[in-house]
C-alpha cells in the first residue's frame, strides 16, 4: 500500500516520497558520527540499497561571502582560513590571487617561491589528513594513528613559519608576511623524508588489504559524464580519467616552470580516488624538491612594491613619516581597487577553488563569490549514492573529501 511522506523542514516541504511496504525513508545525519553534525542525507531505501538520496546542507553556514562585502580587502583574509580549515593556506592564496589579479600586482620571485612551497606543503598535510580519516571511517584505525603522527611534523613546520597550526593566515595580498626562518628548509627536507616513509607504511597496510579493497573498489563510481555535469574538479574529476589540473591548464605562481605529472584514475571509484591522493603526495614532494634550490637563488623582497595597495616594509614605517602615513591610510580606510571584476581559479587539495570579486572602486568588494569544490561534490551525492548499499554510504561520502566550511558559505 503506497504511502506519502512530507518532510517538516520548509526547505523540503514539497518533497514527497512515494513508496511501497518494501521501501523505507532513513535520515542519515546530521547526528551520525560520519556526518560530523554538518550533513543530513534523506535516503530512500529498498532493502539495503539506496534508490534516492537528497543532501541537506547549511548546518555550518556563517555567511562568509556576505562578510566579505562588509570588510576591507585585507580584513577579510583571516575569514578565508575558516573555509576549508584542513587546508587554510590554499584558501588564503586563492583569495589573495583574485585580489592581486584585480590590482594587476607583480609578485616578487622570492615570494612566489615561498608561496608555492607553502601551497604544496599544505596539499600534503591535507591529503594525509584525508587518507587517515577516510581509513578511520572504513575501520582502519592504525592508519589514522600513523598518518596523524606524520601530519604533526608538517603542522610544526607551518607553526614555525606563521605561528598557527590550523588557521595559518600565511599569505598576504601582494606576497607573504615573512621570509622563511633559519633552518626551516632543513626541517622541510626532513619532513619530506618522513612523508615518504609514512606513505610506504600506509600503502603496505592498505593497498593489498582485502577488506580495504572490497570496501572501496566499485563503490561510489563517478563517470566522466556525471563529473562534468556536476562541475566536479580535483581528484573527483581526475579519478574518472580526465587529466584536468589548474596548475597545468592555467598555471599560477611558479607552476609553469616546474616539472610534475597529473595522475588520473581509470574507474572513477573510491579506490581510484584513494590511489590518486597517494600519488599526488609524491608529486608535491617532487615539486618542493625543485623549489628548494630556487629559493637559494632569490633575494628579492617578499612583498609587492605598490604604495597605493601595499604597505611599506615595517622598518620604513617605524622610521619614515611618508611610509607611516601611507600605512595608516591603508589600514584605516582600506585599499581602493579599480572598478572591474575578476575570477581567479586555483587548484586546492579538494579541486577548483576560485574567488569572483566585483569591485566598484570602494574599500570593500561590491560582490564576493566563492567557488568551492566541496559544494559541487556534496551535491553530486544525489547521483553517486543511487544504487549503493547503505553500508557503503559512509565510504562514498568520505571519498569525496568534502569539508563543510567551504560547502556552507
Curated annotation (Swiss-Prot):
One of its GO terms (molecular function) is quinone binding. It catalyses: a quinone + NADH + 5 H(+)(in) = a quinol + NAD(+) + 4 H(+)(out). It is a peripheral membrane protein. Keywords: Cell inner membrane, Cell membrane, Membrane, NAD, Quinone, Translocase, Transport, Ubiquinone. Pfam families: Complex1_49kDa. Gene3D superfamilies: Cytochrome-c3 Hydrogenase, chain B. GO terms for cellular component: plasma membrane. Its EC number is 7.1.1.-. It is an enzyme of class 7 (translocase). The keyword Transport applies. It is found in: Cell inner membrane. PANTHER family: NADH DEHYDROGENASE [UBIQUINONE] IRON-SULFUR PROTEIN 2, MITOCHONDRIAL, NADH-UBIQUINONE OXIDOREDUCTASE 49 KDA SUBUNIT. NDH-1 is composed of 14 different subunits. Subunits NuoB, C, D, E, F, and G constitute the peripheral sector of the complex. NCBIfam families: NuoD (TIGR01962), PRK06075.1 (NF004739). NDH-1 shuttles electrons from NADH, via FMN and iron-sulfur (Fe-S) centers, to quinones in the respiratory chain. The immediate electron acceptor for the enzyme in this species is believed to be ubiquinone. Couples the redox reaction to proton translocation (for every two electrons transferred, four hydrogen ions are translocated across the cytoplasmic membrane), and thus conserves the redox energy in a proton gradient. Belongs to the complex I 49 kDa subunit family. This is NADH-quinone oxidoreductase subunit D.
